[in-house]
């Protein structure tokens, strides 16, 4: 049996203790259309240095994103706030599970300084789930947004938030901080929630996105899913309809990649032509922007996509 360990303070501890009892699931060889360049360029090294100097966590590293080499080469990093330990135990996710430490009051300033040092025109801020906090970390999100606005006024801000389940008023706090894009991922179709995302509720997540538009109709909303988890095509199409009923603007669809033998297995590698078909269908259903490729991830090309998103809204208004 394989147990994934982290080396912290010279002590090995399980990264995913809740998964240690599970039988190993073989990791399939990736098809040729899922190949990426190994990180190591000068841009990557500079991004890595700035992240380390500021004592920050990135979802690029913690989630094992396949695009880290490409993004960090361009000095694009997605900062993961409120620590590196999540209170949830999703079957697809490589982020450490456990009891998190208290919030770091200096983190907003460090994130803001790193954004300025990297010269980011657009930044994505995400977080672990913090079910242990009264507001789920909403106030910390707002503090980070405020600090970035002060340190780098020209930077547009995208947040990728947890679901704030049973955190009354938390969403209002984040929306009031005025991020340019509010992203919350559904991750998968509802039939897979019990095994893939057991701590979450599908229709709560849909309602969260709908509520953002009620609070601020001008705010761009975004959501993403993974395919290859055993979902059926008709389920993905219904999910698109659910998101459009919540007036979500931007949909991302990418291939699920299994982090370790203890995680949910890849049921299928979806070929590129099926991603193109999903993209065509999603546009027909009314999304302003769709990104659907095997390597699509929520924050991949986020800055360029934000520019496209703004233009798509202007184009639609012009033809209304």
Swiss-Prot record:
Which pathway does it operate in?
Protein modification; protein lipoylation via endogenous pathway; protein N(6)-(lipoyl)lysine from octanoyl-[acyl-carrier-protein]: step 2/2
Keywords from the named record: 4Fe-4S, Cytoplasm, Iron, Iron-sulfur, Metal-binding, S-adenosyl-L-methionine, Transferase
Enzyme Commission code:
2.8.1.8
What are the binding positions for [4Fe-4S] cluster 2 in this chain?
Answer: 86, 90, 93
Compartment(s) of residence? Cytoplasm
Required cofactor names: [4Fe-4S] cluster
Q: Does the keyword Plastid apply?
A: no
Q: Which reaction does it catalyse?
A: [[Fe-S] cluster scaffold protein carrying a second [4Fe-4S](2+) cluster] + N(6)-octanoyl-L-lysyl-[protein] + 2 oxidized [2Fe-2S]-[ferredoxin] + 2 S-adenosyl-L-methionine + 4 H(+) = [[Fe-S] cluster scaffold protein] + N(6)-[(R)-dihydrolipoyl]-L-lysyl-[protein] + 4 Fe(3+) + 2 hydrogen sulfide + 2 5'-deoxyadenosine + 2 L-methionine + 2 reduced [2Fe-2S]-[ferredoxin]
How many cofactors are bound and how?
Answer: Binds 2 [4Fe-4S] clusters per subunit. One cluster is coordinated with 3 cysteines and an exchangeable S-adenosyl-L-methionine.
User: Where is composition skewed (Basic and acidic residues) in this entry?
Assistant: 12-31
For the Radical SAM core domain, which residue ranges apply? 72-288
Spans annotated as Disordered: 9-31
Q: What Pfam families does this protein's entry cite? A: Radical_SAM
In this chain, [4Fe-4S] cluster 1 is annotated as bound at 60, 65, 71, 299
Q: Which GO terms describe its cellular component?
A: cytoplasm
The molecular function terms in GO held by this entry are: 4 iron, 4 sulfur cluster binding; lipoate synthase activity; metal ion binding
Concerning InterPro entries, the annotation shows:
Aldolase_TIM, Elp3/MiaA/NifB-like_rSAM, Lipoyl_synth, rSAM
Record has Iron-sulfur as a keyword: yes
- Alphabetical list of HAMAP family matching this protein: Lipoyl_synth (MF_00206)
Similarity comment? Belongs to the radical SAM superfamily. Lipoyl synthase family.
Q: Which PANTHER family match?
A: LIPOYL SYNTHASE, LIPOYL SYNTHASE, MITOCHONDRIAL
This protein's name: Lipoyl synthase
């Amino acid at each position: 049996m394989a147990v994934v360990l982290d080396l912290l303070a010279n002590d090995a501890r399980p990264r995913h203790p809740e998964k240690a009892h599970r039988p190993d699931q073989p990791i399939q060889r990736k098809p040729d259309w899922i190949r990426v360049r190994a990180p190591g360029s000068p841009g990557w090294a500079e991004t890595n240095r700035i992240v380390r100097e500021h004592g920050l966590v990135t979802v690029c590293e913690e989630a094992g994103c396949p695009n880290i080499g490409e993004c960090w080469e361009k000095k694009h990093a997605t900062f993961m706030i409120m620590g590196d330990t999540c209170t949830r135990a999703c079957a697809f996710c490589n982020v450490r599970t456990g009891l998190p430490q208290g919030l770091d009051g200096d983190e907003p300033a460090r994130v803001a300084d790193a954004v300025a040092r990297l010269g980011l025109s657009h930044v994505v801020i995400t977080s672990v789930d913090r079910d242990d906090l009264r507001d789920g970390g909403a106030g910390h999100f707002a503090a980070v947004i405020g600090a970035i606005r002060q340190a780098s006024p020209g930077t547009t801000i995208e947040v990728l938030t947890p679901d704030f389940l049973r955190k009354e008023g938390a969403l209002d706090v984040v929306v009031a901080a005025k991020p340019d894009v509010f992203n919350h991922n559904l991750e998968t179709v509802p039939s897979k929630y019990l095994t893939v995302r057991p701590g979450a509720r599908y229709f709560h997540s849909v309602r969260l996105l709908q509520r953002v538009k009620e609070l601020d109709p001008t705010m761009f909303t975004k959501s993403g899913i993974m395919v290859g988890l055993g979902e059926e095509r008709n389920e993905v199409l219904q999910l698109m309809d659910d998101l459009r009923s919540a007036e979500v603007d931007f949909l991302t669809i990418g291939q699920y990649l299994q982090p370790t033998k203890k995680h949910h297995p890849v049921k299928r590698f979806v070929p590129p032509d099926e991603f193109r078909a999903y993209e065509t269908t999603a546009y027909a259903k009314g999304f302003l922007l769709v990104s659907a490729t095997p390597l699509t991830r929520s924050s991949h090309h986020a800055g360029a996509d934000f520019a496209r998103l703004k233009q798509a809204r202007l184009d639609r208004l012009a033809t209304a």
